[in-house]
A protein has these predicted regions:
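N-terminal amphipathic/basic-hydrophobic helices that include classical n-h-c signal peptides
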Residues: 1-38, 118
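Catalytic core of pol beta-like nucleotidyltransferases
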Residues: 25-96, 102-109, 117-192
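Structural signature of FAD isoalloxazine-binding scaffolds in flavoprotein oxidoreductases
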Residues: 113
Length: 192
């Protein structure tokens, strides 16, 4: 018999759910309810990545965990400004955050962001993305240090679901850590 770890909350013992190791994001979870408050992020793994899955939190928790030196503080401030811009459009439900910023790298160079439209694939979703393409993806990178990607529900099958794609480790990141190419890592979701 496999025993699950026991946790204690206010003096009451309970067993962790049987499926606590599975990724948080599943296609059928849409739409996820809004999360408020400071949701604590899990500790980084031994290899310096978030545990596998999508970790829902807020910007304060991201700041607390990852803005740990002057360079990271600067990157976080740029991210915060970028997400404020995206949020003020009212056309995006959430942002997924990934890249070296959400690892133990001392000097990450940028942040990967996936904006998810609040409407499904179609003209309204493309209209939501339009201001960002008008600004220019390269210009956004120069100003905010953000590699920008988009996702909307119902994208055709040939389109890459970056939410899943960014959970895979690149071979050049996996090999130095002694991980295989199929290894996965976590990403962060922040509601806008």
């Amino acid at each position: 018999m496999i025993r699950r770890p026991i946790s204690f909350v206010v003096g009451i013992a309970f067993r962790q759910p049987r499926f606590h190791h599975l990724p948080i994001f599943r296609e059928r979870d849409k739409p996820l309810r809004k999360r408020r408050g400071n949701v604590i992020l899990p500790s980084l793994t031994y290899h310096g990545f978030l545990p596998e899955g999508v970790h829902c939190t807020n910007l304060q928790a991201v700041r607390d965990r990852f803005a740990t030196n002057p360079l990271r503080v600067e990157l976080f401030q740029k991210l915060e400004k970028f997400l404020h811009w995206a949020s003020t459009t009212g056309r995006f439900s959430c942002a997924y955050i990934d890249g070296g910023f959400v690892t133990n790298k001392a000097a990450p160079s940028d942040i990967d962001v996936i904006l998810q439209t609040s409407v499904p694939y179609g003209a309204a979703a493309f209209h939501a993305m339009e201001p960002f393409f008008a600004q220019g993806i390269d210009s956004i990178y120069e100003i905010y240090s953000v590699h920008l990607h988009f996702w909307c529900e119902g994208f055709p099958g040939a389109m890459t679901d970056f939410r899943r794609f960014f959970q895979y480790l690149r071979p050049q990141d996996a090999a130095p850590s002694g991980l295989n190419e199929a290894a996965r890592k976590g990403i962060i979701r922040v509601d806008l």
